[in-house]
Amino acid sequence: MILKLNGYGYSSNSYLIIGKKNILIDPGTSGTFNILMEELERNGIKDIDLIINTHCHFDHTSADYLIEEYFNCPTIIEDKEVKHLKNGDEVTVSSLFGAKLNPPKEIIPLSEIEEELKSYGLEIIRTPGHTYGSISIIYENSLITGDTIFAYGVGRWDLPTGDVIQLRNSINLLERIANERNIDKLYPGHGEIGDRMAFSYAKLFI
């Protein structure tokens, strides 16, 4: 199952995949860490095995190190964005939030663990456009889309490594996959859960 943990303020939504492993997608900001922990406790979650970041932006990743410290679990991110997460550089857009990104200690490039993730039921789709290392995740006939597409809009493409053509192509790819596999639930990086109507809304923006 996928447990939605609402984002607060400018923090991203977080999602917990509960299956063979407890996998936390996008822990959000360090400023909302305590709220996230309260939600996990309220849902009876005592262990996190892995963190996956859909991309390296501060509002999705700055609580990585706190989750790592508490649960002793590594963070996974697409290979191209490992260096940005480690360095907390301009690609993480931490300066937009007036803060510094403290990276987790153990970061695993996606390519090194992708086959293992398949054994847990996760299929990774590379969806560049919002950033060049953005990913989406298929799990149990649902799509976790990060900031590629929202229920009623699309992610920005004007930030470092963003590209509107890549974003359009990625959204078209996700739409094709959703139609072919009859996936009708989208879990975006911000806002409410969507369905395949999200792809129609996306066309209004790109």
Swiss-Prot record:
GO molecular function: hydrolase activity; metal ion binding
Top-level taxon of origin: Archaea
Covalent S-S links between cysteines: none
Cofactors demanded by this protein: Zn(2+)
EC assignment: 3.-.-.-
Top-tier EC class: hydrolase
InterPro entries on file: MBL_Glyoxalase_II, Metallo-B-lactamas, RibonucZ/Hydroxyglut_hydro
Co-factor remark: Binds 2 Zn(2+) ions per subunit.
Entry-linked Pfam families: Lactamase_B
Keywords, sorted A to Z: Hydrolase, Metal-binding, Zinc
Binding site for Zn(2+) 2: D59, H60, D147, H190
Positions of Zn(2+) 1 binding: H55, H57, H130, D147
Family listed: Belongs to the metallo-beta-lactamase superfamily.
Protein name: Probable metallo-hydrolase MJ0888
